[in-house]
Amino acid sequence: MPTISQLVRKGRAKITKKSKSAALDSCPQRRGVCTRVYTTTPKKPNSAMRKVARVRLTNGKEVNAYIPGEGHNLQEHSIVLVRGGRVKDLPGVRYHIVRGALDTAGVEGRTQRRSKYGAKRPKK
């Protein structure tokens, strides 16, 4: 516990909060170009082929971003919109690609939680 005179001389050290999505530079989303689209396997208890893209953002940073939903149309040189949000069972994947924005198509045949996957309202 510091004395009052020590606090007058030095003051309290400010605790700086580290961003969980530093590559976005305090922006809600960023545009980027896919440099590689691939699948990878998740951590131990889970088993799947997760779809991931390596994206070069407009600020020059390269990130790994998850492609949500079933099926996608992304390939190298696709323009995508990247938002924050990590994938718990994929180490190093701290961003999500926004479905239904720019070159990324929405998920086909999706009827529930459509807005999260860029799917249009189905015809009756």
From Swiss-Prot:
Gene Ontology, cellular component aspect: small ribosomal subunit
Gene Ontology MF terms: rRNA binding; structural constituent of ribosome; tRNA binding
Protein name stated in the entry: Small ribosomal subunit protein uS12
Gene3D superfamilies in the record: Nucleic acid-binding proteins
Pfam families linked: Ribosom_S12_S23
3-methylthioaspartic acid sites (modified residues): D89
Subunit structure: Part of the 30S ribosomal subunit. Contacts proteins S8 and S17. May interact with IF1 in the 30S initiation complex.
InterPro entries from the UniProt entry: NA-bd_OB-fold, Ribosomal_uS12, Ribosomal_uS12_bac
The organism's place on the tree of life at top rank: Bacteria
Stretches assigned to coiled coil: none
Keyword hit for Secreted: no
Function as written in the Swiss-Prot or TrEMBL entry: With S4 and S5 plays an important role in translational accuracy. Interacts with and stabilizes bases of the 16S rRNA that are involved in tRNA selection in the A site and with the mRNA backbone. Located at the interface of the 30S and 50S subunits, it traverses the body of the 30S subunit contacting proteins on the other side and probably holding the rRNA structure together. The combined cluster of proteins S8, S12 and S17 appears to hold together the shoulder and platform of the 30S subunit.
Family: Belongs to the universal ribosomal protein uS12 family.
PROSITE patterns in the cross-refs: RIBOSOMAL_S12 (PS00055)
